[in-house]
Amino acid sequence: MFTLPPVLNSSYVGIHGNSTFINFEFSFYTLPMLFLLVPILYIPITIIIILRILVKLYYAFRDRNNNVYLLSAISISQCMCLLFFLADFLYLRLPTSGLLTSWCASIEPNRFITILTIFTYHINYSTMIFPFLVSIMRLILIISPKNHKKFNGQLLRFSIPFICVYPIIFTFFMFPAIGYCSYAAYPFPFGAIIFRIERTFFGLVNNFSLLFNTLFWMTCCIITNFILLLLLIKSRCLLNAQTRSMHSYKVEVSLSLTTFSMIFSYLSNAMIVFLLLELHIVGHYASPIW
């Protein structure tokens, strides 16, 4: 029989109640603080891209464009990326900057940190699937140009609920946990903290499942885009020179850039997971509930 964990004793968990961290004085001149400011560069660009895609989606709905489902998937994907940036900012960048250290050391372990942890992992797992979904929809567009609207519509209606539910498989064991603040080990400077959780179901951790999902969806995305590229090259050879220069070449360049950006995002995510595993940050869950 499962029971919810009692509130953790702050005297022996993380930095809670530790006077050294309570009296910590934050400094702007640290490397984690620089990383905290990095999102200022790419989040506005992401918002502009999302707005442009939404405008195109509006006109696609108005004009009954056949690519409306593909544009819808891309729009949702970009919105999920924006949520991921927000989760990454709150879960990793903000605490490691040292801004929350004194405050976090003066409070008790709580479930708000658990909620933030679950939200971050949920968004991360969901975001991984969208590049593969967009690639499949583009593949359907090439393979079945006459019926792609029907197939892509059915695929999108199935995929959205699946993407919402799928991450629960890898986060359900976090639901009864208690979140707390812990100091971040080297190479982070003194005062940098990270969020962790205690007492998950069965003592399950999220490190290898996160790595598995990253590699799995990256592999699926690479295979799908490789097939797309082959089909695109084949179709390009069948077009006349004028059509090829005006249409196929632009699509091929766009596809190549899209493929590269997708693979790069997976690789960067995998490298971060490897780094955090090395630092014992990802999946540091203890004291299982029975």
Swiss-Prot record:
Compartment(s) where it occurs, according to its Swiss-Prot or TrEMBL record: Membrane
Main location as per UniProt: membrane
Keywords: Membrane, Transmembrane, Transmembrane helix
InterPro entries reported for this sequence: 7TM_GPCR_serpentine_rcpt_Sru (IPR003839)
GO CC entries: membrane
Topology in the lipid bilayer: Multi-pass membrane protein
Transmembrane helix listed as a keyword: yes
Membrane-spanning residues: 31-51, 70-90, 112-134, 158-178, 185-205, 213-233, 262-282
The family this protein is said to belong to: Belongs to the nematode receptor-like protein sru family.
Designated name of the protein: Serpentine receptor class U-26
Organism of this sequence: Caenorhabditis elegans
Lineage of the species this protein comes from: Eukaryota, Metazoa, Ecdysozoa, Nematoda, Chromadorea
Gene that encodes the chain: sru-26
